[in-house]
């Protein structure tokens, strides 16, 4: 039997993906980032701001990473 993931389950999965990412962005990652930001806004969480380098790598400020980690923990606890 198949069932569709809820928005909360999708958001948790995308946060796990994003927080464990290898810092090199591929074309498919841009779509995931877009969906992640859409779901974050749906749950009244500020979207992710990513800084890109000229080599298609990105970095995340520590404050931003901590904020996302707190949001992830809160969502996991509510699940």
Where are these regions (language model features)?
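Short intrinsically disordered terminal tails
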Residues: 1-9, 65, 70-79
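N-terminal acidic leader/helix
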Residues: 2-29
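Acidic, low-complexity, intrinsically disordered interaction modules
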Residues: 20-69, 73
């Amino acid at each position: 039997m198949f069932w569709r993931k809820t928005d909360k389950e999708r958001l948790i999965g995308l946060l796990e993906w994003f927080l464990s990412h290898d810092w090199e962005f591929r074309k498919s990652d841009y779509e995931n980032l877009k969906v992640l930001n859409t779901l974050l806004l749906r749950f009244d969480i500020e979207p992710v701001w990513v800084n890109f380098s000229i080599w298609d790598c990105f970095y995340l400020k520590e404050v931003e990473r901590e904020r996302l980690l707190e949001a992830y923990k809160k969502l996991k606890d509510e699940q």
